[in-house]
């Protein structure tokens, strides 16, 4: 029973991490598209379908090994490609670079607002509160982690 509990408790955070990383990467591609670069669009990477974004090592093997050995998740998705030469301005380049981080922060803020609204109305169950807290923590963690100023993170 303990093993099943651990696996079920790990599945929700894993799915949230995968979904949040995909939104993060699609945000980069969409920002590049808005700035004039169609690379991600032409390669079919402006999609929420997880298949084109999954890196077998970073999205499957490493997260599962990390969870079953350390009880935590670590992983990555394929970066959405863009051609910086197609971006019109330096501000456009900054917009593309920051789009993923801003997306993760937006997810966290919107989830926090919904959390507060449900709490005030008295309809927030402990299970829902824990799930929403997980969404907030995953996305804030991804945003902060991507601020690290070393390649391949967004902070570069």
Where are these regions (language model features)?
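Hydrophobic transmembrane alpha-helices and their immediate loop junctions
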Residues: 1-156
